[in-house]
Amino acid sequence: CSKLLFQSIAILTAIALVYLFREKAIELFTISICITNTAIMLLSIPGYGLAASIQSLVTCLVTFGEADGYALQLEIHDLTFVFGQMVLYYAVFAPHTTRQEKRKRWRYLLLCCWFFLIGMKRSAIPAVLLFVLIGLLLRKRKVPDWLYPAVGGCCILFFLAFLYCVRNGIISRLLNSVGVDMMGRDYLWSLANPYYELSITYLGHGFEYVDTIIGQWYDAGLINQAFPFHNDILKVFVEMGFPGFLLWSGIQYVLTPLFWQHYADQQTTLLYLCELGYMTVTYLTDNTAFYFWSTMALRLVTLAYVMERKKPPEPKVWMPDSRQEMRDRIRILMQEG
């Protein structure tokens, strides 16, 4: 119940913001998270000193993630993943017709890129680049109506194959063979094997069950820190079972794209799927599916984008003809007479 309540508050907050501010909600949300991240950066400096903080940050950026000291404090998981969503939006979908819109777009894009990079979630950076490229390739193309829901259906099939590979250690062996440091994820995933089965009759253990068994493993000394699975696809399957997992993924990956395609247009559907696709990469290796701000941003950006695209045209105000227009009109009438 707590998870449902938590997620409901995030989604309802996004709806309320869009209801109050319409298309301005994205800009206000961006400003607020930039201010929040800046405040965290400034408040963390006294603990390390200015020179050491700058050196730590530069080292993290140059080495692509060797975070220590001050830079480690800036690895603000929820906010960093949200900045990835905002980078995707401003790079591909933000309005850029007028000069003012172009300036605003570039200003926010640079800010979001900066905060996204200093958060240094290495799995998220290539994911953002991938879906920026996909968005740029598809945003002006007319595709069949069945394509985006079909992509969502393929994602669900991929998740089931992914779970099979996780359970049988295929993912772990593959990544270890190419030298990828899984940072203990493979061990956590193997510990979970006795608690679920890949079967259509598996009904799950209920919400928060994974947190319970993680606590038990920690108390038993099996793990050093009570971290979740770092695999939200596995977590949802263990807790909700096969039917619940199909419901959870079907709503997000099939029904929601169908809704946006019917209510709005293909470009809105593409925005939602690009944002969701980026977040899906993090679902596979992290605990982001139920982060408060990530959940809010995923809904808020698409909702506010719809408000921008569905704005009624500005009413035309009658203006009298100019002196030159009147002369031209009289000349035409005289020629016709």
Short names for language-model regions:
Residues 1-20, 28-34, 38-41:
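Aromatic-anchored transmembrane helix interface
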Residues 8-13, 113, 125-137, 252-253, ...:
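Hydrophobic transmembrane alpha-helices of multi-pass, membrane-embedded glycosylation machinery
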Residues 15-25, 89-99, 133-142, 166, ...:
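Structural signal for the C-terminal ends of transmembrane alpha-helices
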Residues 27-55, 73-138:
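Alpha-helical transmembrane segments of multi-pass inner-membrane proteins
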Residues 42-51, 118, 136-178, 194-198:
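A membrane-periplasm/extracellular boundary helix in multi-pass inner-membrane enzymes
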Residues 88-90, 273-283, 287-337:
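Transmembrane alpha-helices of multi-pass inner-membrane enzymes
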Residues 145-147, 239-280, 303, 309, ...:
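Hydrophobic transmembrane alpha-helices and their immediate junctions
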Residues 176-240:
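Long extracytoplasmic/lumenal interhelical loops at the membrane interface
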